[in-house]
Amino acid sequence: MKSVLLSPQAVRVIDYLNSVNHVPTIAEIGSAVGLSASTTWRILKSLRSQDIKFKAVTNLANLGLTEILLMYRTRLPIDRIPKKLLRSLIRTLEGVTLLRYVTKVHEVESSVNYVIAGIGVEPSEVYVLDTVIPPKYVSTHIARGSLDKIYLRELIAVASAPHPLGRSHSTGRVDPIDIALVNELEEDALIKIKDVYKSMKKVGGVPSYQTILKHYRVHILERGVIVGIRPTLEKFIEKHTAVTKKLLVMYGTPHSLSKGVRAVTAIPGFMEAYLNAKEGVAYTVASIPLGLIPKIVDFLG
C-alpha cells in the first residue's frame, strides 16, 4: 500500500469529530484542536477533496422508532424488496441478503409481516436492533499511513475502556421533518440547517426555516438522536489500497459482543455497528484492505 499521511492538524480534526456525540460548529472544532476557524474550514475542505467526510450516527430509538433486521440466506431479487421504510440493503457474495427497516416501536410485528408479504419468503432470522455503537477509530492508523496494520494493544484498550450509558432522553412524536433531518445528517453531519431547508424546499410543501431549526434543536439534539460522528473513510482507503467489502455478523454474550464490536470498529473502514443485546447478535460492514483480513480473523478468534 502506498504511504498515506495526513497532516497532524487534519488528524486532530478527525479525532475530535470522531469523539463527539453532537454536531459542533466550525469555531467549536477549531477551539478544541487549537486552530483558527478559517484554518479548520480549510482542513475540512481538504479532507472532503480526499473523500473524507463526516456522517452522523443516529439512534432512532430516541425518536420513538426502532430498527429491525431481516436476514435471508438467499440472494433476493431487488424488485421483490419493499422499499417503504427500508433503511439499508446488503447483499453478500455468499448469497446472504440483509434488510434493515425502520418502524414505530409498537408496529414491529406488522412491519415484519408487511416485508414478508411483499417478498413472499420467510426470513431465516429477524432481530430488533436496540443499540447503535458508533465507531471510535484509533487515529494512529490514519496518522502513520499504516492502514495495513492492526495495533492490537490499541484496539483492546478501546474495547476495554468504560463506556457510560449516558443520560436517557425523552421520546415524543416523530414527523416527516425529523426523518428528513436524520437523512440529511446521515449524509453530512456538518450540513447547515439553511441548506437542509433549501433541499427540502425543492421537494415542495416545506415549513419555514424556523420550524425546521426548532425540530433540529428540540427533536434531534435534545432527544440525543445523534450518538456519534463517523469519518467516512471508505473511499479514501479504496483509493490507496485493494479492499474488499465485508459484512461481519457477531454472536455472543452482551458483554463480549460489545467489547468485540468496539474493538473492530476502532479500525478505519468499519462502519457503525447495530446490536440486539438480548439476542446476542451484532452486525457491521467494512471496507477492509486485503492484507488485514487474516489479522482481523486472528484477532476475533
Segment roles from a protein language model:
Residues 1-301:
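A compositional/biophysical signature of low hydrophobicity enriched in polar/charged and small residues
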